[in-house]
Amino acid sequence: KVTTGDSQVMLALASGKSIRFEEAKTRPMGRTASGVRGITLQHENDEVIGMVAVNDMESNILVVSEKGYGKRSKLEDYRITNRGGKGVKTLNISEKTGDLVAIKNVDDSNDLMIINKSGLTIRMAVEDLRVMGRATQGVRLINIKDSDSIAAVAKVAHQEDADEVLEEGAEDAIEDGTENDTDTKENQE
Protein backbone atom coordinates (compact mmCIF):
# COMPACT_ATOMS: atom_id res chain seq x y z
CA LYS A 1 0.00 0.00 0.00
CA VAL A 2 1.30 3.43 -0.90
CA THR A 3 1.81 5.97 1.85
CA THR A 4 0.70 9.58 1.59
CA GLY A 5 3.41 11.35 3.58
CA ASP A 6 0.86 11.82 6.37
CA SER A 7 0.24 8.11 6.95
CA GLN A 8 1.02 6.16 10.07
CA VAL A 9 3.26 3.09 9.98
CA MET A 10 2.88 -0.07 12.03
CA LEU A 11 5.63 -2.67 12.29
CA ALA A 12 5.16 -6.06 13.97
CA LEU A 13 7.68 -8.53 15.39
CA ALA A 14 7.53 -12.33 15.52
CA SER A 15 7.75 -11.98 19.32
CA GLY A 16 4.25 -10.42 19.38
CA LYS A 17 5.13 -6.73 19.76
CA SER A 18 4.21 -3.91 17.39
CA ILE A 19 4.87 -0.21 17.10
CA ARG A 20 2.84 2.62 15.54
CA PHE A 21 4.47 5.89 14.50
CA GLU A 22 3.99 8.80 12.13
CA GLU A 23 5.48 8.36 8.66
CA ALA A 24 6.76 11.95 8.89
CA LYS A 25 9.19 10.78 11.63
CA THR A 26 11.25 9.02 8.94
CA ARG A 27 13.19 11.38 6.72
CA PRO A 28 13.61 10.79 2.97
CA MET A 29 16.87 9.01 2.09
CA GLY A 30 18.76 7.89 -0.96
CA ARG A 31 18.47 4.45 -2.48
CA THR A 32 21.74 3.23 -0.98
CA ALA A 33 21.05 4.49 2.55
CA SER A 34 20.68 1.91 5.31
CA GLY A 35 17.54 3.55 6.71
CA VAL A 36 16.48 4.25 10.29
CA ARG A 37 15.40 1.93 13.09
CA GLY A 38 11.66 1.34 13.09
CA ILE A 39 11.42 -0.97 16.11
CA THR A 40 13.90 -2.56 18.53
CA LEU A 41 14.06 -6.36 18.27
CA GLN A 42 13.32 -8.27 21.50
CA HIS A 43 16.09 -10.90 21.09
CA GLU A 44 18.64 -11.96 18.49
CA ASN A 45 16.27 -14.43 16.77
CA ASP A 46 13.41 -11.91 16.59
CA GLU A 47 12.43 -10.42 13.23
CA VAL A 48 10.01 -7.95 11.67
CA ILE A 49 7.16 -9.98 10.16
CA GLY A 50 5.22 -7.18 8.52
CA MET A 51 4.43 -3.53 8.01
CA VAL A 52 1.13 -1.75 7.57
CA ALA A 53 0.63 1.77 6.19
CA VAL A 54 -2.43 3.22 7.93
CA ASN A 55 -4.41 5.87 6.06
CA ASP A 56 -7.90 5.09 7.44
CA MET A 57 -8.01 5.69 11.19
CA GLU A 58 -11.27 3.71 11.47
CA SER A 59 -9.68 0.48 10.22
CA ASN A 60 -8.70 -2.48 12.39
CA ILE A 61 -5.41 -4.31 12.80
CA LEU A 62 -5.51 -8.07 12.24
CA VAL A 63 -2.67 -10.31 13.41
CA VAL A 64 -2.17 -14.05 12.82
CA SER A 65 0.16 -16.46 14.62
CA GLU A 66 2.01 -19.42 13.10
CA LYS A 67 -0.28 -21.98 14.76
CA GLY A 68 -3.48 -20.48 13.35
CA TYR A 69 -4.55 -18.06 16.08
CA GLY A 70 -5.54 -14.52 15.21
CA LYS A 71 -7.54 -11.50 16.22
CA ARG A 72 -8.67 -8.11 15.13
CA SER A 73 -8.07 -5.04 17.30
CA LYS A 74 -8.97 -1.38 17.05
CA LEU A 75 -6.22 0.84 15.70
CA GLU A 76 -6.72 3.23 18.63
CA ASP A 77 -5.58 0.45 21.02
CA TYR A 78 -2.05 1.03 19.71
CA ARG A 79 -0.69 4.33 20.97
CA ILE A 80 1.43 6.46 18.66
CA THR A 81 5.08 6.43 19.76
CA ASN A 82 8.42 7.42 18.33
CA ARG A 83 10.00 5.03 15.89
CA GLY A 84 12.77 2.82 17.25
CA GLY A 85 10.97 1.91 20.48
CA LYS A 86 10.30 -1.57 21.86
CA GLY A 87 6.64 -1.52 20.86
CA VAL A 88 3.57 -2.79 22.70
CA LYS A 89 2.17 -6.30 23.01
CA THR A 90 -0.15 -7.04 20.11
CA LEU A 91 -0.69 -10.77 20.71
CA ASN A 92 -0.06 -12.96 23.74
CA ILE A 93 2.59 -15.29 22.34
CA SER A 94 2.70 -18.77 23.87
CA GLU A 95 3.65 -22.29 22.83
CA LYS A 96 -0.02 -22.77 21.92
CA THR A 97 -0.10 -19.80 19.51
CA GLY A 98 3.43 -19.81 18.14
CA ASP A 99 5.16 -16.68 16.86
CA LEU A 100 3.39 -13.89 15.02
CA VAL A 101 3.50 -14.34 11.22
CA ALA A 102 1.24 -11.64 9.74
CA ILE A 103 -0.18 -8.18 10.36
CA LYS A 104 -2.85 -6.65 8.11
CA ASN A 105 -4.87 -3.44 8.05
CA VAL A 106 -8.51 -4.58 7.58
CA ASP A 107 -12.13 -3.49 7.71
CA ASP A 108 -15.48 -5.29 7.38
CA SER A 109 -15.35 -5.10 3.57
CA ASN A 110 -12.37 -7.50 3.40
CA ASP A 111 -11.96 -11.25 3.36
CA LEU A 112 -8.93 -13.09 4.65
CA MET A 113 -7.12 -15.91 2.79
CA ILE A 114 -4.98 -18.11 5.04
CA ILE A 115 -2.67 -20.78 3.61
CA ASN A 116 -0.77 -23.29 5.71
CA LYS A 117 2.50 -24.96 4.69
CA SER A 118 0.76 -28.23 3.80
CA GLY A 119 -1.30 -26.35 1.18
CA LEU A 120 -4.70 -26.00 2.87
CA THR A 121 -6.32 -22.65 2.06
CA ILE A 122 -9.32 -21.10 3.78
CA ARG A 123 -11.20 -17.90 3.10
CA MET A 124 -13.11 -16.07 5.82
CA ALA A 125 -14.91 -12.76 6.12
CA VAL A 126 -13.14 -10.27 8.38
CA GLU A 127 -16.53 -9.13 9.70
CA ASP A 128 -16.95 -12.62 11.26
CA LEU A 129 -14.02 -11.94 13.61
CA ARG A 130 -15.01 -9.96 16.66
CA VAL A 131 -12.84 -7.03 17.73
CA MET A 132 -10.69 -8.00 20.73
CA GLY A 133 -8.32 -6.19 23.06
CA ARG A 134 -4.75 -5.56 22.02
CA ALA A 135 -2.98 -7.86 24.52
CA THR A 136 -5.18 -10.96 24.13
CA GLN A 137 -4.37 -14.38 22.66
CA GLY A 138 -6.98 -14.31 19.93
CA VAL A 139 -9.13 -17.12 18.55
CA ARG A 140 -8.32 -20.13 16.38
CA LEU A 141 -8.77 -19.09 12.74
CA ILE A 142 -7.64 -22.36 11.15
CA ASN A 143 -7.05 -25.84 12.54
CA ILE A 144 -3.56 -27.08 11.75
CA LYS A 145 -1.57 -30.14 12.73
CA ASP A 146 1.30 -29.93 15.23
CA SER A 147 3.94 -30.25 12.50
CA ASP A 148 2.28 -27.62 10.27
CA SER A 149 2.22 -23.81 10.41
CA ILE A 150 0.83 -20.80 8.56
CA ALA A 151 2.63 -20.04 5.29
CA ALA A 152 0.82 -16.90 4.11
CA VAL A 153 -2.03 -14.54 4.94
CA ALA A 154 -3.61 -12.21 2.39
CA LYS A 155 -6.35 -9.59 2.50
CA VAL A 156 -8.75 -9.87 -0.47
CA ALA A 157 -12.04 -8.31 -1.60
CA HIS A 158 -15.11 -9.60 0.22
CA GLN A 159 -16.59 -12.64 -1.58
CA GLU A 160 -20.12 -11.24 -1.91
CA ASP A 161 -18.68 -8.11 -3.51
CA ALA A 162 -16.76 -10.25 -6.00
CA ASP A 163 -19.93 -12.24 -6.83
CA GLU A 164 -21.90 -9.02 -7.40
CA VAL A 165 -19.23 -7.70 -9.76
CA LEU A 166 -19.27 -10.98 -11.71
CA GLU A 167 -23.08 -10.92 -11.91
CA GLU A 168 -23.06 -7.28 -13.09
CA GLY A 169 -20.45 -8.17 -15.71
CA ALA A 170 -22.58 -11.08 -16.93
CA GLU A 171 -25.68 -8.85 -17.13
CA ASP A 172 -23.73 -6.24 -19.10
CA ALA A 173 -22.47 -8.96 -21.47
CA ILE A 174 -26.02 -10.23 -22.06
CA GLU A 175 -27.27 -6.70 -22.76
CA ASP A 176 -24.38 -6.11 -25.20
CA GLY A 177 -24.97 -9.49 -26.87
CA THR A 178 -21.42 -10.57 -26.07
CA GLU A 179 -22.16 -13.42 -23.70
CA ASN A 180 -21.16 -16.10 -26.24
CA ASP A 181 -18.12 -14.30 -27.65
CA THR A 182 -15.65 -16.05 -25.34
CA ASP A 183 -13.75 -19.10 -26.54
CA THR A 184 -14.26 -21.97 -24.15
CA LYS A 185 -13.19 -25.59 -24.62
CA GLU A 186 -16.79 -26.45 -25.51
CA ASN A 187 -16.94 -23.74 -28.19
CA GLN A 188 -13.59 -24.76 -29.69
CA GLU A 189 -14.53 -28.45 -30.13
What kind of feature is each model-predicted range?
Residues 1-189:
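C-terminal interaction appendages of subunits in large macromolecular complexes
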